């Protein structure tokens, strides 16, 4: 009787296979969803990239790389699961490991950036100031490239980031303003310079002038100069990258989600290999 049952199982191998978890089906569905999403994102980013000016392309350029990587990974994963192709699975996981390397590296960078972004509240005001020297050398070099700073500077001037501070206001009102990081670092001199306040973008030398600080010498009342050449301006650009990056929690969730999809694909691949050996 036991032999009859064994023969029945051999005649109906699909019963045993159907009892196992359907990793291949789940991976096929998830890859299809990823494929549609990545394709839509890729088209949207490419369209936005060619419609924006040079100043905004530093945002869309990484988006092209990310969306193309997701598109390639999803496409190979979908066809690998659909055709049960060992070769396509290998290509898929090669792209997946590259993707995970980028995601983990970005998460580490965000953690370091979060630890080093520490604005100081200037006494007696509501103005926070940023210091370029607070950032590690590798962090500052990664975000701020000296040979490309002129492009960033030109874009800041072109976008009129300091326009809000053009009108005259009392010093007491200015010192209680909630300035954005760029307004604080690029549109006014460091308050430690000891300059006399005339209006937000106009300051004059006083007897308390601090000529030892390099940024104090770089300040100019000209609308095309202001503090765009200051280290404080470079510091707030780094801080702005921190503010526009995903939070640490979101990065961790992103890593966990990617690993779950990757493990599902891995088990689907193992099952296909096992079936091909039978």
Curated annotation (Swiss-Prot):
Keyword ATP-binding: no
The keyword Iron is annotated on this UniProt entry: no
Keywords: Glycoprotein, Membrane, Transmembrane, Transmembrane helix
Alphabetical list of InterPro entries matching this protein: TET_plant (IPR044991), Tetraspanin/Peripherin (IPR018499)
One record GO biological process: primary root development
Transmembrane segments: 26-46, 63-83, 93-113, 250-270
Stretches assigned to the Cytoplasmic side: 1-25, 84-92, 271-278
Positions in the Extracellular compartment: 47-62, 114-249
Major localization listed first in the record, in broad terms: membrane
Entry's Gene Ontology cellular component terms: membrane
Residues of this chain annotated as glycosylated in UniProt: 202, 220, 243
Function: May be involved in the regulation of cell differentiation.
Family: Belongs to the tetraspanin (TM4SF) family.
Name recorded for this polypeptide: Tetraspanin-13
Gene: TET13
């Amino acid at each position: 009787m036991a032999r009859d049952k064994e023969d029945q199982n051999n005649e109906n191998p699909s019963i045993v296979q159907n009892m196992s978890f359907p990793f291949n089906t789940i991976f096929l569905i998830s890859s299809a969803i990823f494929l549609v999403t990545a394709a839509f994102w890729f088209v949207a980013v490419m369209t936005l990239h060619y419609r924006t000016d040079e100043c905004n392309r530093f945002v869309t350029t990484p988006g092209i790389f990310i969306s193309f990587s997701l598109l390639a990974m999803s496409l190979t994963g979908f066809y690998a699961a659909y055709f049960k192709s060992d070769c396509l699975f290998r290509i898929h996981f090669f792209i997946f490991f590259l993707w995970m390397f980028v995601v983990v590296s970005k998460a580490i960078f965000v953690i370091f950036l979060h630890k080093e972004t520490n604005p100081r509240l200037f006494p007696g005001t509501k103005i926070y100031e940023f210091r370029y020297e607070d950032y590690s050398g590798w962090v500052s070099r990664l975000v701020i490239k000296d040979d490309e700073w002129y492009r960033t500077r030109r874009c800041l001037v072109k976008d009129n980031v300091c326009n809000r501070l053009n009108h005259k206001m009392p010093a007491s009102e200015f010192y209680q303003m909630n300035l954005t990081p760029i307004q604080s670092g690029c549109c006014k001199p460091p308050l430690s310079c000891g300059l006399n306040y005339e209006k937000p973008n106009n300051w004059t030398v006083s007897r308390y002038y601090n000529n030892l600080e390099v940024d104090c010498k770089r300040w100019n009342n000209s609308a095309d100069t202001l503090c765009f050449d200051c280290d404080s301006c470079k510091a707030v650009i780094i801080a702005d990258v921190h503010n526009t990056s995903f939070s640490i929690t979101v990065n961790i969730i992103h890593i966990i989600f990617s690993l779950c999809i990757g493990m599902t694909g891995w088990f689907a691949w193992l099952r296909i290999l096992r079936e091909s050996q039978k």
